[in-house]
Amino acid sequence: DHRDLHSFPTRRSSDLKKYFKRYHVALGNLLLLEYENGQKEAFLTARTTNGRCITSKDAALIMGEVMDGTRWSPAKDSRSIITKQYETVRFLEEGGYRMLYGASRIPKKGEKYSGDNYTFCESPGNQVVMSLSDGMGSGETAARESKQVVELTEQLLETGFSPRAALKLVNTVLLLAGPEQHPATLDLSCIDLHTGVLEAMKLGAVPTFIIGEEGVEIMEAGEVPMGILSGVEPVLMSRKLWEGDRIVMVSDGVLDALPGDDKEQAMQQYLESVEEMGPQELADQVLDFAVSFIPAPRDDMTVLTAGIWKRRS
């Protein structure tokens, strides 16, 4: 139910066939998918008619001209070249926004492995997913456990699950695995590059910080360790992101290193003082700031950052 499938409108279909014919490309079947966020995905069965090849990137440019000047690109898992044999190529309408990312981490003192795992991935519908999984404890066991949680989440998103449905399923899997499995917390930020809307989903995870024009916002959920209580709903928060907003996600080891009782406020005040910089530099600086208060890392420490900007045509 996350997308609707229908044929191209007759006139649009006719325009595409005529336009591609000018470039010596014959089109067969045309299918159009539309996601809940309004983003479109197209499947074109195509072949060249002059015995030569055309790249899917060039075909995407042709398509954009017919589709009201919108920007399209071939899907990463689709064919990169159209040849003289009919093949189906998948195209995605590009979102109005683009993102850049950064990550910085350090394991607990004395450990070779970090029990924190993170990922950045693009799921269908122009959704960018940042996930941070914090293994209970540290070292190799926690690393393996949190890696499994992150990989399962990625796989579910890639097969078309919504972020909320993916999290609920991951939580169920952990419950079935039992408490002896060193359950991990999960922090998921899903950014829709079509609309600029961020959905943050947390299961036992520490707050996320959004640096915007109005200051630094704290997005937090109540503490519920993932896989501990049955029937626990993931806490879902939503926020519209604007040009230049920056997202900062941290593992609990980062906040715990900060001075005072109100760790969130200490981080908020620090982030309000940082200058404009790239996401990777920001991630490094946040980690350096946290580490500066302790003689050695008492826990795994991870910082993820992302910045959002409007895509220029």
What are these regions (language model features)?
Residues 111-125, 183-186, 218-259, 293-298:
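Acidic loop->beta-strand submotif enriched in PP2C/PPM serine/threonine phosphatases
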Residues 15-39, 50, 58-87, 94, ...:
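Catalytic core of PPM/PP2C metal-dependent serine/threonine phosphatase domains
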Residues 1-13:
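Short, small-residue-biased leader/transition segments that mark boundaries at the very start
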Residues 37-41, 96-98, 124-129, 243-246, ...:
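Short hydrophobic/glycine-rich mini-motifs in sensory/regulatory modules
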Residues 93-117, 171-177, 206-238:
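PP2C/PPM family metal-dependent serine/threonine protein phosphatase catalytic domain
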Residues 84-135, 141, 148, 234-236:
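N-terminal entry segment of metal-dependent catalytic domains or homologous docking segments
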Residues 135-159, 222-223, 241, 245-297, ...:
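Active-site-proximal, acidic helix/loop segment immediately C-terminal to a metal-coordinating Asp/Glu
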